[in-house]
Amino acid sequence: MSDSALMEKFEQEVWSKVPHREEKDGIAQIVNATPLIDLTDDLKECAKTVYDVDISDKDFKIYGKFDNTLPTGSIKVRPAANIIHDAITTGKISSGTTVIEATSGNFGIALGLLSKIGVTAIALVSRKLQEGVFKELRNGNIRIMDLDMDICPAPGMEDKQDMLVAKATAANVRSQMIELGFDPETFDNNISDIETLLAKKDIINLAKFLAKIYDLFCPEQYDNDLNVDAHRTVTGVEIDQQLHENGESLENYNIVCTFGTGGTSGGLSKYFDEQYSKKGVHVIFPPDQQDVAGIRTVGNADGLKYYNPELYAGKHQIDFEQAKPLLKFMVEKGHDMGESSALELYAALQMIYKNGGNYVVMICDGIDKYRKNFEKIGNTITPTQVSQQDVATNANDYDKVIWVHTQYTPREEGIELLAKSLGIDKSKIIIPNARTAQQLLSGQQVPEEIDQALQESKGKSLMVCMAGRTSLMAANVLAEKGIQTDSLTGGITGLPESKTKDLSQIIEQASQF
């Protein structure tokens, strides 16, 4: 049964401010449309001044659909509002309901609108979000559950690694659930299923499972057809409506978008098919291993319900490093757009250079969340990976060696082995606890102990872990904050001296404190 009082609040605080269909004088139209801005001249200038490419003789037109102007600043408010409206209508959400969802940021931020109607939202985040995203989640009164527990593999433990990570992460989730006021007994009674989901890194179904056992509402954005319908019935119609006002039609355009859940590409593809019997959506992906604003790579998209490449007009892989100068140009021109928009515009530029054409690029969010990374464009610090021989040869250059790992720590014999192998005095080796390491890897701030060690250093600082992966991650986190460090390739287990030792002689389970 619908909660009429809650629906009234929702319509007043949310629905009235987002794009939706309304009938006026018997004619259905979209209200609260976001701006559709002609970017043609600016893209011509960008191509010439930034990439030394002349597209002035190409027959093309390009618009930006600026959804960064929506409440909470992103396109994700469209499906979020559609799903919540339906959930209140059908009685799945009522006063006192808690909403939980897996998100890479923007959908969770959109759920922050629920605080305006007295509904609590919890966001499960499973990737290292940029500081600006965490800030907006917190400012939106979202309860954040951070599932990041990156663990560097330990030799001899590879087969057990996924379960080790799952158990460590489950303990982390349990403590956060308690902090949020949930009964730990319910969690403990379902621990096997939870660890299985975590071992598979299946955060999407973890959100669904927690909703089930705690009687919460999960929007299920990755599997909810209302996500796709929001773009099929509103976004597509809205763009077409605006083009018609300019004497044009979406029939003569293609849309360029990136892939998060597949809702935008899926809904707009359906609109093109139903209205114009054509494939009209070009979907853009970053390369594998490149993390761009929560946008999925092809590998991460494959297998999701709404990843349907057979519906697309084109599928493109764009290196964000190539698109960064374009992002800088457009933002400095006064266009508020985020990282995903740069990928789309760069892809559109490539297509226009080859064949011309007309495009609408989805500007899914603005630059504010990514401001810190944006300011580093053209001034990037890159960590150096160094071998044991490199360090030993230049031992006098290194003033601090910092161990970083969330599961293991060197014993006294391991510390002595590090000092001897690297030719560095043992007093220069810093061993923070596991909690401090996790705080550093979360990317939010540099823990006091590590910050102090770095500030005291009069030379280079070297990050060391078990096998080299976690230390490189830590060095990258520090680089993002403008701090230069090196990372030891292969870690402690890659040192020649360690190969003659039993691992348990030099390494032990890390303490949290």
PLM regions with names:
Residues 480-481:
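C-terminal interaction modules of eukaryotic adaptor/scaffold proteins
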Residues 414-426:
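Substrate-recognition/cap helix-loop segment adjacent to the acidic, metal-dependent catalytic center
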Residues 488-490, 497-500:
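Extended, charged low-complexity segments
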Residues 1-399, 407-413, 432-441, 452, ...:
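PLP-dependent amino-acid enzyme catalytic core
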Residues 499-513:
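Active-site neighborhoods of enzymes that stabilize oxyanions during catalysis
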Residues 463-464:
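Short, surface-exposed ligand- or partner-binding patches at beta-edge/loop junctions that are enriched
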